[in-house]
């Protein structure tokens, strides 16, 4: 199952690396959930908590649960249109003047029509029809099955560190995917800076459960990993920052546990494309 709002900074292209490393757990948290790509791809846990400081994202998930039919109706009649993209941007900038469903629709449109799926990005277009085909597929994939996946979920709109601390337990698995350091990933008002990263690492030193932290290579993380005996799994992925700037970037998956392939067969199975 794929996330309905994949976007810049999400981990869709890393799922084949992430899912096999997920350990056995009963409680699952995504304190920086964004598009929640890992949650939608993995098998359900007994308790699941998603959180994002961006209220428009948490409103989207809430509307999926409560107003699915209304939101689906708005999505079905959406065409690949520069004007609709601009209108969605206006809604996202002034959410207080619009209904929850209109705000949720705007998030979906911006994630699907913006270049690199950045919510503050420019209108994405091409000359091959790929964008319109992807939009049609996204409409077809926006089904009640997605809503059913959210039924057992707790949705939070809090500071990510508070969520990790609140739901931490020996049988918790925290998937921790913050914005890249000194970036807002096109979705947040404030930049995630080095001080924020150090506060996060200091908290992760104390957790009772298991965690996986994703980030590009960063000296501070390497220092904490060496200090605490955390394992760094390194992969390369393509980063698209603009229409003409695509580059290879090393990405780290930092874990406080040993890889356990057999446990991952139950907890981290990829549920289809």
Where would I find each of the regions flagged by the language model?
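Short, surface-exposed loop/helix-turn segments at secondary-structure junctions
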Residues: 188-192
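Short active-site oxyanion
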Residues: 24-27, 46-47, 150-154, 205-211
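SAM-dependent nucleic-acid methyltransferase catalytic core
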Residues: 1-13, 21, 67-185, 202, ...
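Short loop/helix-cap segments at secondary-structure boundaries that form the rim of catalytic
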Residues: 39-44, 166-169, 221-227
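SAM cofactor-binding core of SAM-dependent methyltransferases
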Residues: 20, 24-92
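Short, polar loop motifs at secondary-structure junctions
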Residues: 33-37, 141-142, 216-219, 258
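Short His-Asn-centered micro-motif
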Residues: 31-32, 51-52, 156-158, 176-178, ...
């Amino acid at each position: 199952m794929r996330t309905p709002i994949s976007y810049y900074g999400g981990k869709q292209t890393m799922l084949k690396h992430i899912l096999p490393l997920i350990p056995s757990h009963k409680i699952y948290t995504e304190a920086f959930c964004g598009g929640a790509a890992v949650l939608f791809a993995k098998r359900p846990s007994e308790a699941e908590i998603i959180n994002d400081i961006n209220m428009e994202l948490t409103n989207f998930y809430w509307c999926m649960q409560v107003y699915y039919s209304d939101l689906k109706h708005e999505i079905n009649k959406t065409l690949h249109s520069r004007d609709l993209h601009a209108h969605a941007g206006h809604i996202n900038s002034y959410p207080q003047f619009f209904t929850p469903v209109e705000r949720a629709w705007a998030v979906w449109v911006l994630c699907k029509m913006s270049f690199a799926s950045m919510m503050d990005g420019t209108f994405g277009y091409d000359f091959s029809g790929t964008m319109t085909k992807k939009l049609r597929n996204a409409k077809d994939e926006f089904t009640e099955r997605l809503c059913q996946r959210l039924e057992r979920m707790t949705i939070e709109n809090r500071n990510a560190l508070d969520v990790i601390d609140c739901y931490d337990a020996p049988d918790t698995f925290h998937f921790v995917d913050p914005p890249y350091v000194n970036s807002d990933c096109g979705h947040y008002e404030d930049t995630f800076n080095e001080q924020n990263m150090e506060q996060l690492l200091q908290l992760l030193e104390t957790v009772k459960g298991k965690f996986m932290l994703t980030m590009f290579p960063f000296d501070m993380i390497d220092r904490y990993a060496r200090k605490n005996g955390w394992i760094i799994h390194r992969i390369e992925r393509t980063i698209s920052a603009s229409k003409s700037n695509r580059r290879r970037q090393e990405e780290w998956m930092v874990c406080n546990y040993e890889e356990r392939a057999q446990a991952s067969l139950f907890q981290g199975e990829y549920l289809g494309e």
